[in-house]
Amino acid sequence: HWRLALGARNGASTVRQQVSALSFTGSQFDDLDEVAVEVSANTHDFTTDAMRFAYRAEPQLLTITPCTGSVLGVTNFSLVGSALRGGSDSRIMLSNATVHASWVYQGGDTLLGVAPPLGSNTTVFVNVSVGLNAQQFTGGLDFGYFIDPRVDEVSPSTGSVLGGTLVTLSGSDFSGGSVYRCRFGDTLTDASVSGDISDHLLCRLPPQLPVTPRAVEVSLNGQEFSSSGLLFVVYDTPLPSSLSPSSGPSEGGTLVQMQVQGADLSIGSHYLCRFAVVVVNATYA
């Protein structure tokens, strides 16, 4: 029971006091159910308002997608697990910062949240935990913060409308990603880290893009993209129409001029000619 000392010191006069809120710690309850909560001011007489308090199972977390995001925050992520439904004030805690969460069913219990800013410009992993009442939290997953990437060079910077061009993007802060993507204008394609070179990403040019310059950006989690503003030019497939001369000695050394149709070769970035399996440098004139 609880006691309060109210009024004057000697009882000669009294002052009416009104209590508007009580704080207490919920007791253990073996069954997962809703119970009525009443209060008493004298250990005997209880209210009869039948306010409801729900006992819930402890949440269990399985996956977080994406599992990385920008240090600037705003990454939308989903937490999949069990016993995530029915919270009165569901929150997700990343390190020491909490954000509101909303429950949805996506093949199972799922909580949606938005990652808060990290507050420092560094790559780091933080613990992720969930509380259905904004007080008790349980966790077990990690979320990685990365520094926003920057693209400094695109090679080659042109490609055929047929697609398939292997494009190398050079820059900085490409490490710490979970879902690598390249974006040509509004079109996304998968990307991968170039072997042991952490400042190089590789991606294939998608087919049938409009024949026009398009901004090329990268993402480390499939959501937030760089804003470097470098351009990639898509061109029509060149069709050779004539060779002059069309023959030469086996020793090589013949200067060959090729006429083409269907493409503006002046926008090219890397000019090459291939004789059977032999590739040689070429110049545009």
Protein language model annotation of sequence segments:
Residues 50, 97-105, 139-140, 187-195, ...:
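Short, surface-exposed loop motifs enriched in S/T, G, D/E and P with embedded aromatic residues
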Residues 30-31, 36, 44-88, 134-178, ...:
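Beta-strand/beta-sandwich contexts
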Residues 29-33, 116-123, 207-212:
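Surface-exposed, short loops/turns at beta-strand junctions within beta-sandwich domains
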Residues 2-29:
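Ligand-recognition surfaces built from glycine- and aromatic
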Residues 38-40, 129-131, 219:
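Conserved Ser/Thr-centered positions that define the repeating blades of beta-propeller domains
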Residues 77, 108-116, 169-170, 198-206, ...:
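A generic structural motif
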